[in-house]
């Protein structure tokens, strides 16, 4: 009886994974067909530039003005992005998932090609780590709303460009957000080391 139940469970799990994969590729195919590629290219590029540029600009300004609280904020935001990208790239090369345009060249049109594996989305992880850490640091609606919309736009852009599955983007968002919250505790220790 145990073997029958185990066999049924294995078949059900396999069927659920096939269904999830179908949802993933069907969503990419649909979103990839939307003609928003210029906007997506802009969002996608900003997802690589802003997560580095914002904390760097904050840090440089803080050093020039000798503003230690701002420098602490820059360190928190910058280390959050670094942590998110570290986790993301460790997973990317451990899992080594093919990009949608490589696995389904007849169904997905790549707007831009990438050299790294697909899962999870590094651009999305970086965008959500920046958006979440900014929102935690400056909890005002005029910081939270635009940064959240921008991060979601980066995730959408990666699917629209055909370079990621929705599961890549969702996992990247979870990693980026999670690193921002985890880094609150890590930076308490780091602030003692750097600033006291």
Feature locations, PLM:
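Bacterial Sec-dependent N-terminal signal peptides
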Residues: 1-23
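Membrane-water interface at transmembrane helix exits
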Residues: 15, 61, 88-96, 135, ...
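N-terminal transmembrane-helix/juxtamembrane module of multi-pass inner/ER membrane proteins
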Residues: 16-58, 72, 89-116
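Juxtamembrane loop-transmembrane helix junctions in multi-pass integral membrane proteins
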Residues: 35-42, 69, 135-138, 142
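Interfacial segments of alpha-helical transmembrane regions
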Residues: 63-86
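Short helix-capping/hinge motifs at transmembrane helix termini and TM-loop junctions
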Residues: 64-66, 95-96, 139, 162
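Small-polar-interrupted transmembrane alpha-helices in polytopic inner-membrane proteins
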Residues: 79-93, 144-157
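Membrane-embedded catalytic cores of phosphoryl/pyrophosphoryl-handling enzymes
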Residues: 105-196
């Amino acid at each position: 009886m145990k073997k029958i139940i185990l066999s049924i469970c294995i078949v059900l799990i396999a069927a659920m994974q096939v269904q999830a994969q179908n949802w993933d590729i069907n969503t990419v195919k649909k979103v990839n067909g939307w003609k928003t590629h210029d906007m997506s290219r802009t969002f996608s590029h900003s997802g690589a530039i802003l997560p580095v540029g914002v904390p760097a600009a904050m840090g440089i300004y803080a050093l020039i003005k000798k503003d230690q609280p701002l420098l602490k904020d820059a360190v928190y935001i910058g280390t959050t992005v670094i942590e998110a990208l570290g986790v993301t790239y460790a997973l990317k090369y451990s899992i080594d998932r093919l990009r949608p345009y490589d696995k389904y060249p007849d169904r997905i049109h790549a707007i831009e090609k990438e050299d790294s594996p697909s899962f999870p989305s590094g651009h999305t992880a970086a965008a959500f780590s920046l958006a979440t850490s900014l929102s935690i640091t400056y909890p005002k609606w005029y910081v939270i709303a635009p940064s959240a919309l921008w991060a979601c736009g980066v995730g959408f852009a990666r699917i629209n460009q055909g370079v990621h599955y929705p599961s890549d983007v969702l996992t990247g968002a979870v990693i980026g957000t999670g690193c921002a919250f985890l880094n609150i505790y890590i930076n308490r220790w780091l602030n003692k080391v750097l600033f006291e």
